[in-house]
Amino acid sequence: MASAGGGGSESAAPEADRPQPRPFLIGVSGGTASGKSTVCEKIMELLGQNEVDRRQRKLVILSQDCFYKVLTAEQKAKALKGQYNFDHPDAFDNDLMHKTLKNIVEGKTVEVPTYDFVTHSRLPETTVVYPADVVLFEGILVFYTQEIRDMFHLRLFVDTDSDVRLSRRVLRDVQRGRDLEQILTQYTAFVKPAFEEFCLPTKKYADVIIPRGVDNMVAINLIVQHIQDILNGDLCKRHRGGPNGRNHKRTFPEPGDHPGVLATGKRSHLESSSRPH
């Protein structure tokens, strides 16, 4: 009798005693102006519209740009002249990035730094990010460091023609009031070489490569369907691996990791001021 009673109390355990939800973490990489953030927004939009389990999932987009290092006075002076390399791996605070993503994966509330490219400084204000069902983390070098790369449940690489990326970047920066000569000098001196040396080689780590970015709706729809299957606990899809047929090296979140408590239907998008990528 005592054993039966104990079992009944366990089934009635309060919500606070149950395991905390763990987000489905997606890494999205690609060159500057490849359309990474646009792809993230489209995935977020489609996941929000397609009511999985008759509810909206809470979705968050984070940018690697938030984790730029605090610059010294000398580095700031170079940045103002377009002479600082924001595309180099050493430009990022990888320790803080790893710690933040680790806490996100563990279902914890985190504070994400805010980086201002107008003043080239990390602002005192931070953005609080609460546990979410799906977190998309985008940036040019999100696959560069193995300890960060291995945290993603799904890795996407947005593959866009270099001429298209350059034209987008020039148009975007000119609209922000930057000098055309400085834009092109920075691109040839830092952006293009860094892409070829640091970003492009990480393409091999992607589970899915998306040619043409958001214009490739066939690929994006397949990715969204795959994410929905994973979140719904479709074991067949989980064991087969990603949409490209390759098995993942990591374990996807368990079916019970996404309880209804997070089903707020709210969507968040964190983006740094005047982001370079």
Swiss-Prot record:
Keywords: ATP-binding, Kinase, Nucleotide-binding, Phosphoprotein, Transferase. Pathway: Pyrimidine metabolism; CTP biosynthesis via salvage pathway; CTP from cytidine: step 1/3; Pyrimidine metabolism; UMP biosynthesis via salvage pathway; UMP from uridine: step 1/1. It comes from Mus musculus (Mouse). Belongs to the uridine kinase family. Substrate binds at residues 87, 115, 120, 169, 178, 186. Pfam families: PRK. Residues 268-277 have a biased composition (Basic and acidic residues). Residues 238-250 have a biased composition (Basic residues). GO terms for molecular function: ATP binding; cytidine kinase activity; uridine kinase activity. Its EC number is 2.7.1.48. Residues 1-30, 238-277 are annotated as: Disordered. It catalyses: uridine + ATP = UMP + ADP + H(+); cytidine + ATP = CMP + ADP + H(+). GO terms for biological process: CTP salvage; UMP salvage. It is an enzyme of class 2 (transferase). Gene3D superfamilies: P-loop containing nucleotide triphosphate hydrolases (3.40.50.300). The modification Phosphothreonine is found at residue 251. Phosphorylates uridine and cytidine to uridine monophosphate and cytidine monophosphate. Does not phosphorylate deoxyribonucleosides or purine ribonucleosides. Can use ATP or GTP as a phosphate donor. This is Uridine-cytidine kinase 1.
